[in-house]
């Protein structure tokens, strides 16, 4: 499913190139230009000359009895010159231990344009909260990251289904618990393996 991120005034501008960004081989794009991505593993279009992508890598590594699922911390990747369609490749890692070493420093992502040239980028590891599940509430963490650096986006997601109404519809009180459950399930899926283990331990301690 494609998601289009566009500048607020894109309908008035004719010189902005819509670039397709495709994650490859276990790369998940969680946020793009401050907006959460609905389908982290799917290609998306960005209507901007630059892009900030919050990504993480998840894959089953190793072989046989040594196979483990690796989930990286989120990284903030900034592409200053987005002039063509690109593919985002993860670092070349083949074991859980190798991946741990690679993602403890500055992982070597590869961003390749359709022209075949490598696209330059900068990156930072997203700073999480203290304690277990440090990346719970990732939207707030990204907002803080950008605020500290003076980064502001005028981009927004244009979805296929657009519903307009003249009045705000108040949610019934009975839906609050369901909403909380959905949100918890969402962040559990986004959490790394270690974060999930810590969360399950915390749940047992509450009983």
From Swiss-Prot:
Keyword terms: Signal
Entry-linked InterPro entries: UPF0319
Signal peptide location: 1-18
Keyword Signal set for record: yes
Superkingdom of this protein's organism: Bacteria
Family in the record: Belongs to the UPF0319 family.
PANTHER family reported in the protein's UniProt record: UPF0319 PROTEIN YCCT
Protein name, per record: UPF0319 protein VV2327
């Amino acid at each position: 499913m494609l998601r289009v991120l566009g500048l607020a005034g894109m309908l008035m501008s004719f010189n902005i190139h819509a670039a397709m960004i495709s994650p490859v081989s276990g790369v998940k794009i969680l946020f793009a230009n401050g907006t959460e991505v609905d389908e982290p593993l799917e290609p998306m279009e960005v209507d901007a000359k630059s892009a900030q992508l919050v990504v993480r890598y998840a894959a089953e590594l190793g072989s046989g009895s040594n196979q483990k699922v690796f989930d990286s911390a989120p990284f903030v990747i900034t592409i200053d010159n987005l002039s063509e369609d690109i593919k985002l490749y993860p670092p070349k890692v083949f074991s859980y231990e190798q991946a741990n070493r690679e993602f403890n420093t500055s992982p070597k992502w590869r961003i390749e344009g359709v022209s075949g040239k490598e696209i330059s980028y900068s990156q930072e590891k997203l700073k999480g909260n203290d304690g277990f599940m440090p990346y719970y509430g990732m939207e707030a963490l990204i907002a803080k990251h950008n605020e500290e650096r003076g980064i502001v986006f005028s981009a927004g997601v244009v979805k296929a289904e657009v519903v307009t109404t003249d009045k705000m519809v108040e949610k019934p009180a009975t839906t609050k618990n369901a909403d909380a459950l959905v949100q918890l399930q969402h962040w559990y899926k986004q959490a790394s393996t270690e974060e999930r283990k810590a969360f399950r331990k915390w749940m047992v301690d509450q009983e």
